[in-house]
Amino acid sequence: MSGLDWNTFLAILRAGLWEQELRLPSEPDAAGWERLLALSRSQAVMGLILKGIAQLPAEQQPPEEIRPVLRTMEEAFARANARYARVQGGLLSLLTDAGLHPVVQKGSEAAKYYADPSARQVGDIDIFLPDGEFQRARALFPDARIASDGAVVLVQDKVTIELHPRYYDIHRPARRLPAPGSPCGEILLLTAHIFKHVIGHGLGCKQLCDMAVSLARLEGKYDKKALRAALQYAGLMRWHRLLCSLLVADFGLDPACCLTGFQPVDPERLRRIVRESGHFSHHAKTKAATAGAFLRRLPFSLSYCPRETLATVRELALGNLLTRGK
């Protein structure tokens, strides 16, 4: 993939993400459009790219031979969204009818911050159950498997569901972290969640768009000093700065939406990971593949979040030993 393809892809992605009109310096030919659409699939941002294409003037729309591909993408995207909504609605009804209080989290929660939530490409459904409710929820799905981090994992109608016993994927006492579901908490959660993508299966533009729109829509609705303190306590401050630097440079985030006094750093190292790995669902998700990716990125993860990286290694090792013994 050429730098020109990537830059054109990002321009269209930003237009879709922020719903802004766009005129490209030069439009791709048919082969270029095919590469861009393939990239939108591997980065899990098909809906946003379709939105971005709609922001182009008539003379820069994809050529006629690409229209069937676009229609196929639109139809597949709509079917996936409908299936996801059906599964999530049924799951939440089941849990609430059982007297539980499920909290939608991660990307599923970030969808509400998009100008058009239906433009976000669906993935897994992540649900947090508050204290005392996780075991009751687990009993509703006796055939589900238990992941190495303790989450209950099942699949319904091709949609993966994960029920989590803790809100944060952070190895710090929860009582000293922001309240689950609070604006500050959502930003901290996404910061940690995206880091786990980087060191594991891979990171795509989808998660970065989640973070960008969350920061933009939550601007002015939380205490930035409190977020800074939480990031420092969690050992995620240096990583958060790198993440925001990439969002400002490539995804159109206003620097004012970052922490007070934000000073960007060169995001090239993270940009390269995103370009090379893409969204994890388009790659092998075997334990061997994940372990290989984790080891390759160990120098990166240790340089930005050493404490969280080492804690994750310990947790995964212990979790694998426990699940192997069952």
Please identify what each model-predicted range represents:
Residues 1-123, 129-326:
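Conserved NTP-donor binding/palm subdomain of two-metal-ion nucleotidyltransferases/polymerases, i.e.
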